[in-house]
Amino acid sequence: RMARREIGSITVGKRDGKRLTLDKAFMEHCKSEDAPTFTQYALRKACFRGGFTFTAAATASEVVQNVVSLDVTSMHHTFINGRQMPEDFVVVSNHDMDVFAERILDTPMQYVLDNYDRPFDVAIHARIRFDNIRLRKGTCFDKWGIALEPASKFKKELMYQEGFGEDERNLLQDNCIRQYGWHDVANNAFFAFGKLYRADSAIMNVSETELWCLGQVYEWDSMEALFGEATAKFRTPPDFVTLQSNELFEMKSAAKFISKHYKYGEPYPYNLSGIPEGIANELRNGTCDPQFFESWYTGTVKGMFNGIYGTQAQDVRRPSYKVERGELVIDDTTKVTAENYEDHEPGNLRVLYTYGLRIVGGSRMHMVISMELLYRGLGDRTRVLGGDTDSMKVSCDADVSDDMLAKALEPIADASKAAIDSTMSRIRRNWPDKASSLKGIGSFDIENRGEHYPWHIELWNKCRVSWDGERAHVTCAGLRRPIGETNIETVITSLINAGYPIEEVLQEAIGYN
């Protein structure tokens, strides 16, 4: 609502004698890029992948020392604001797709970094067969045991688990396209930590960014395109979305600064631009409740900021709910199939799925490149242990400093800045009052510089335990840690403080059972 009211109403010209707003222009763009056929719709969904969550097999369940957390600043916004978007996809011959795929795979990493706003001259959604696929020898991925392709993409059906955050409607529509065969397929495959490590053959649905990442992580004997669509036409991402990102980044940065420096009862002396007037007045007077401000910052500002990507990644054709016997249930009559696809054309469309697919695809590329940069710069002196979407844990030799880590990752920070500066030039020229410098976006922040975790263990995806010398820090999806109550963190901390060996406690405290 904020976007449509404050940004969507901006006039950008006239059409047929009527005012053309950013909102109207964006809806027209979304409509023109909507998949024209069920086959293209299903292919695009099959190409979509979430953030890169992984565990390094070489060090899984092993207690390691001197571990640092590297976190990307506003990962998705790097690609909301710093990547040219493809448009006007058309189905192409398999021969042409083979040529496009080879060109993408032949692109050197340095070229990708030098042209981070548009690393390839063609964009694709393709179904490709790979024979004898395995981790690429001599790479950091082979050495650390890190694979890329999620096992979930190879399943014929996904199971709904209530309470795990997934919308049941998304799952149902995903399973619908899988019934038509739109899922990845592998023969005699080996999976571990939720990833494909090798297979005699595999058929995968990939975009250009995912295909390039595949070429960095895996090698294969032969490759053949089976179907796909492509385009060589690119454009600056929609101002309707990037202006939201710019404004909310400034608001988020200001709110983060305020939460660190505001003291209740004392007038706030610093700049309050970007903060809503009512809250700004209370801050000036020193009467703003710190708990309220923190709640507004974490719940509203960060929520809106993080929600921009999610909006562009949603499936507008997912089925609807209906009320049946007083309960909400999925209305099966609204499920989109190959037979009724044309009957489910969306109305006012504000979702650009090809954009959302490449925002998260860019984040996966960012992580792949970052690991290669660490290995290129520091070799065996660092070991990536695991990661999740925009962060990774790295074990370092004792003589590896934070400055050395930052230096190794400097190329991707420079590439991100250059890509954003290039892509955002129009916004900065046309709306300087709304534009942001987006400073630091895409670069890695070293958590607690100089204070590495002396002990750490990666167990499985999204499950890890760190010991900071005084207490345990546990990340484990689905495991509750109620504040003020006995939980896994207090148990591990108590056991170690009682004299039990750290390595034994970290390995035994959490398990599947």
Regions found by a protein language model. Name each.
Residues 1-513:
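Conserved acidic
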